[in-house]
Amino acid sequence: MRATGTLQVLCFLLSLARGSEMGNSQAVCPGTLNGLSVTGDADNQYQTLYKLYEKCEVVMGNLEIVLTGHNADLSFLQWIREVTGYVLVAMNEFSVLPLPNLRVVRGTQVYDGKFAIFVMLNYNTNSSHALRQLKFTQLTEILSGGVYIEKNDKLCHMDTIDWRDIVRVRGAEIVVKNNGANCPPCHEVCKGRCWGPGPDDCQILTKTICAPQCNGRCFGPNPNQCCHDECAGGCSGPQDTDCFACRRFNDSGACVPRCPEPLVYNKLTFQLEPNPHTKYQYGGVCVASCPHNFVVDQTFCVRACPPDKMEVDKHGLKMCEPCGGLCPKACEGTGSGSRYQTVDSSNIDGFVNCTKILGNLDFLITGLNVDPWHKIPALDPEKLNVFRTVREITGYLNIQSWPPHMHNFSVFSNLTTIGGRSLYNRGFSLLIMKNLNVTSLGFRSLKEISAGRVYISANQQLCYHHSLNWTRLLRGPSEERLDIKYDRPLGECLAEGKVCDPLCSSGGCWGPGPGQCLSCRNYSREGVCVTHCNFLQGEPREFVHEAQCFSCHPECLPMEGTSTCNGSGSDACARCAHFRDGPHCVNSCPHGILGAKGPIYKYPDAQNECRPCHENCTQGCNGPELQDCLGQAEVLMSKPHLVIAVTVGLAVILMILGGSFLYWRGRRIQNKRAMRRYLERGESIEPLDPSEKANKVLARIFKETELRKLKVLGSGVFGTVHKGIWIPEGESIKIPVCIKVIEDKSGRQSFQAVTDHMLAVGSLDHAHIVRLLGLCPGSSLQLVTQYLPLGSLLDHVKQHRETLGPQLLLNWGVQIAKGMYYLEEHSMVHRDLALRNVMLKSPSQVQVADFGVADLLPPDDKQLLHSEAKTPIKWMALESIHFGKYTHQSDVWSYGVTVWELMTFGAEPYAGLRLAEIPDLLEKGERLAQPQICTIDVYMVMVKCWMIDENIRPTFKELANEFTRMARDPPRYLVIKRASGPGTPPAAEPSVLTTKELQEAELEPELDLDLDLEAEEEGLATSLGSALSLPTGTLTRPRGSQSLLSPSSGYMPMNQSSLGEACLDSAVLGGREQFSRPISLHPIPRGRPASESSEGHVTGSEAELQEKVSVCRSRSRSRSPRPRGDSAYHSQRHSLLTPVTPLSPPGLEEEDGNGYVMPDTHLRGASSSREGTLSSVGLSSVLGTEEEDEDEEYEYMNRKRRGSPPRPPRPGSLEELGYEYMDVGSDLSASLGSTQSCPLHPMAIVPSAGTTPDEDYEYMNRRRGAGGAGGDYAAMGACPAAEQGYEEMRAFQGPGHHAPHVRYARLKTLRSLEATDSAFDNPDYWHSRLFPKANAQRT
């Protein structure tokens, strides 16, 4: 039985050891400090206990269980392992207190001043309910305090407990009496020591059974079974990590006497330096950082800083630091916006210890004297000294009354700044007036008056202020900021000797004496001017810095005849007063100071230099040898061999650990530097071959062994993208990269050789392209780029569409254009530009990826088939789809689709269409629909990217220009409407950039772009003159039922044939032309103000609506006319940059739903032939006029004059439908009637004086006045003249010249052409132009 009991105890101890190892993460809960006081009945007390201690392991405080009923279930207390204060159990009726895991009661707080456990009166005199058992089966340690258990009538076995084995303090009081009498005996395995009658209730002895060699607790009776000195409550082994609980602190499972200090002694620098492994004391645990609601005070986690310290944020750590005087305190001032109008006796106490006044300070007569109206007594003048702590006033200082016995304002002697954020009356920040007894100002520390004026007046005794150089105090211009008058005359002040001290400089002074100088002539000491510093004599010795005298360090020895120090530190002394430790003078040599490897001990030699003791000295020494150690000489001499062996072993271990640590840290630093060197382009990588040094290509050629693929990120038409790591040869670092594997699908070619194109791709380096780190040739080509964890821009806009704003979208458009322009400069065609191939380097910076990949493939692999699922047909230009022709202008087409994706937040282009249908739709003029957020300005930029003729598409340089211009005013071009409500998150919109920031950040210097758009607008306004006039009507909103087409497929027709059918006949009613409601191609959102369209903020539906109104006449005129010559209209005319194309005579062309003119090749009469070339989609131009003073009506894309004759009725059939010229107010002469038979010739464009020949774009509706021959657009006639090929045609009809007999040519729509005419391989298609060319040659 005895052996069985011993085995059970050992098993129990092992289970405790495992629990201690797993218990590093403890549930901590607060204790209470109520004593015997309770609130409510027994049920209420039980609920309070349950809320406090459910699943609690460590009670930070006291565990108080008082007045709990007999039916209370206290099983939730079983998890408590430690109580830092005391345990109080009183006046309860439950039978068992279940604390089976309680091991340690620390007793940091004791009950009644001396007891850590207090158990009393736990029974009910009127019933049999009482406490019968304390189940403290694992309690083995009470670190402080005694035990009191008395008057518990039914409580048993308390007298069997050996409390001396539990209580650590020898003299602690233990009172156990008057408890249960008729108790069952302990179980026989417990040997008379138990907490209850069962075999599991035995007391665990950890001190009285120990061998004499043990200083504390033990885990067995043998001498080698002693616990570590820092253990509490027992242990499972001799190490400090084997403790059941820690006596002082638990540092990551090890019991230590103190947590790692924040400062350690460095033997090399002889200084205390920050310890990188410091930890802080949080209760009984060492933590690397305090909880978020605690602050660090030295090495402790505290709830609040002590009064003489202030809380500061240092490197993200909240710490308590000494204030160095008075701790900062901000107080509310007086005056406007404050609760008080003046300083008075009712609020003077609120300024105690204030260092900063938030607002103003007013001293009025109602505040210093009795205020009978508000019943405020007079102010005690002595209380004005509370303002001696004030250093800053953010508002103004107004002193209009002052106590008679105070002759200056010395209570503000520490005031340094008057902010002037709020000013008094006429802009005064310092106002002093009508103080009859004041002789000097006394603002000896005032250095700055940030804003406002100075007013000093009617102070009859005031002197000294005449000498002040106010320009040193006033920030900014000081002219007219001083108003000083009606004070004591300067002559009287000089006669009485009220002048500045001779030690003051020419800057003047605030009053008499050397302490009132604005600046000193020689030196100053603590604000007082002096003739010299104590360099060679006087106490203390001083040194000078910026004309100020500072004391030497106290450990410096005063020298005679020479300087004592040259700085304030202990290392700046010429000689030391006591001892020198390295370069520093110290009061004593280090004795037990904690170093990186343990305590440091030193001794002073004959020259008072501190020398290190022998490494085996643990209590100091008198010399360098082992026998010079203090306190251990006899022990060490008695066991010399053992000491040497232990010393050598420890030294070797320390050397190994230290070397391992240094090696690990060095490798870590080396890896960081290597990664920076490999990833940053700034450091050129040395080529493998010296012959390559002349080649500036920075592409690295990888080996197969350097790259490891981790997972597949995606696949495309050119290959598969993997996430991987790059391990440079000879390095141990792992750099995350993206690896794109390109394989020859035919299997006939490998990528063993490194071509010039591969090196050219690797040499590209720009902020808005994904940089190629290198490539790995082989059977498949592997392109390695830096891994961008944010992913593609396509996924980003889909996920964050609710938070993206117009500024960010336009900025991204600029950056993509800049990246593509850089590729264009380096002759690199992308071929696969799409939003999925634009990566996010940061939320505000994008980079173009996957450029130049197609050129790495063999010719067979470059043939893209329509049937291939991954072929990017929807992003390709027509010439690329049909002929495999890839140029920078085909990339422009893809850029337009990419911008469309961006503006639709990642919508799929041509959704719902098969790939084989897309080329036919594009040939017919169909294009993607206008995104809802885009105004017509942005959409027209996209449309120009999708022109059939690649030569008239904009370049990336021009696209960067255009988007940069729009990025200056994002809400003008992108209108994003989101539902507002309490749950709607605000959009994370970046701030709008200024013009200078856009010039520096968005456009590179090499673009050489003209960013002075304001000057262009002014020039445009000047050239327009009075041509812009008020419209006679505005657009009306169509009803939803009027919509003809809702583009569900994500595209819109460029040539809407039904537009002509929707146009109704016009009639002249009452001399005024009436317009009907136009029919829209898209549903228009309701609730949108019509005025937005005139400000440049229109949706796609509204833009089409506005354009078609200029074609279709209606029967009603708008009620609210609005000028069209506003800023949005001019902005649109600037943004719609059109290619220079020939013009057609009036009556031969008609705009489609997007404002594009679709002329036929041949003019058609009654029997004209339709055979000929197709006309490509183009933009209409507007002819000039000589009559500038007439009223015209403008629309975005067209203009229409009031009073034009009615049109002939429209034909009913589509075949009979003709195109009608939009400017119907032409001067129709007799020659115009014959224009139907005249061939058309291209217009000659005469550049104006303000333009350059290489200007690629002109504005859409730019009006010219008389003398338009020298303008941007040349006038054109109906028929060519013999001498010049054309004659001038008047664009506007003169008064009284009507030609109602003129017939308009009927042209067939593009949609109705035969398949042979629209086939893409038809050469006529590619030789077509926006306007027919008479001398075009067929090829």
Curated annotation (Swiss-Prot):
<dbReference type="GO" id="GO:0014037">
    <property type="term" value="P:Schwann cell differentiation"/>
</dbReference>
<keyword id="KW-1133">Transmembrane helix</keyword>
<keyword id="KW-0675">Receptor</keyword>
<dbReference type="GO" id="GO:0043524">
    <property type="term" value="P:negative regulation of neuron apoptotic process"/>
</dbReference>
<dbReference type="InterPro" id="IPR009030">
    <property type="entry name" value="Growth_fac_rcpt_cys_sf"/>
</dbReference>
<feature type="modified residue" description="Phosphoserine">
    <location>
        <position position="684"/>
    </location>
</feature>
<feature type="disulfide bond">
    <location>
        <begin position="504"/>
        <end position="517"/>
    </location>
</feature>
<dbReference type="GO" id="GO:0043586">
    <property type="term" value="P:tongue development"/>
</dbReference>
<feature type="binding site">
    <location>
        <begin position="786"/>
        <end position="788"/>
    </location>
    <ligand>
        <name>ATP</name>
    </ligand>
</feature>
<feature type="disulfide bond">
    <location>
        <begin position="556"/>
        <end position="573"/>
    </location>
</feature>
<dbReference type="GO" id="GO:0043066">
    <property type="term" value="P:negative regulation of apoptotic process"/>
</dbReference>
<dbReference type="GO" id="GO:0016328">
    <property type="term" value="C:lateral plasma membrane"/>
</dbReference>
<dbReference type="GO" id="GO:0010628">
    <property type="term" value="P:positive regulation of gene expression"/>
</dbReference>
<comment type="subunit">
    <text>Monomer and homodimer. Heterodimer with each of the other ERBB receptors (Potential). Interacts with CSPG5, PA2G4, GRB7, MYOC and MUC1. Found in a ternary complex with NRG1 and ITGAV:ITGB3 or ITGA6:ITGB4.</text>
</comment>
<dbReference type="GO" id="GO:0021545">
    <property type="term" value="P:cranial nerve development"/>
</dbReference>
<feature type="glycosylation site" description="N-linked (GlcNAc...) asparagine">
    <location>
        <position position="469"/>
    </location>
</feature>
<feature type="disulfide bond">
    <location>
        <begin position="227"/>
        <end position="235"/>
    </location>
</feature>
<feature type="disulfide bond">
    <location>
        <begin position="290"/>
        <end position="301"/>
    </location>
</feature>
<dbReference type="GO" id="GO:0038131">
    <property type="term" value="F:neuregulin receptor activity"/>
</dbReference>
<feature type="binding site">
    <location>
        <begin position="713"/>
        <end position="721"/>
    </location>
    <ligand>
        <name>ATP</name>
    </ligand>
</feature>
<dbReference type="GO" id="GO:0038143">
    <property type="term" value="C:ERBB3:ERBB2 complex"/>
</dbReference>
<keyword id="KW-0472">Membrane</keyword>
<feature type="disulfide bond">
    <location>
        <begin position="323"/>
        <end position="327"/>
    </location>
</feature>
<dbReference type="GO" id="GO:2000672">
    <property type="term" value="P:negative regulation of motor neuron apoptotic process"/>
</dbReference>
<keyword id="KW-0418">Kinase</keyword>
<dbReference type="GO" id="GO:0007422">
    <property type="term" value="P:peripheral nervous system development"/>
</dbReference>
<feature type="disulfide bond">
    <location>
        <begin position="500"/>
        <end position="509"/>
    </location>
</feature>
<dbReference type="Pfam" id="PF00757">
    <property type="entry name" value="Furin-like"/>
</dbReference>
<dbReference type="GO" id="GO:0003197">
    <property type="term" value="P:endocardial cushion development"/>
</dbReference>
<feature type="disulfide bond">
    <location>
        <begin position="190"/>
        <end position="202"/>
    </location>
</feature>
<feature type="active site" description="Proton acceptor">
    <location>
        <position position="832"/>
    </location>
</feature>
<keyword id="KW-0547">Nucleotide-binding</keyword>
<feature type="glycosylation site" description="N-linked (GlcNAc...) asparagine">
    <location>
        <position position="408"/>
    </location>
</feature>
<feature type="glycosylation site" description="N-linked (GlcNAc...) asparagine">
    <location>
        <position position="437"/>
    </location>
</feature>
<feature type="disulfide bond">
    <location>
        <begin position="231"/>
        <end position="243"/>
    </location>
</feature>
<dbReference type="GO" id="GO:0032869">
    <property type="term" value="P:cellular response to insulin stimulus"/>
</dbReference>
<keyword id="KW-1015">Disulfide bond</keyword>
<keyword id="KW-0067">ATP-binding</keyword>
<dbReference type="GO" id="GO:0043235">
    <property type="term" value="C:receptor complex"/>
</dbReference>
<feature type="binding site">
    <location>
        <begin position="832"/>
        <end position="837"/>
    </location>
    <ligand>
        <name>ATP</name>
    </ligand>
</feature>
<feature type="disulfide bond">
    <location>
        <begin position="214"/>
        <end position="226"/>
    </location>
</feature>
<dbReference type="InterPro" id="IPR000494">
    <property type="entry name" value="Rcpt_L-dom"/>
</dbReference>
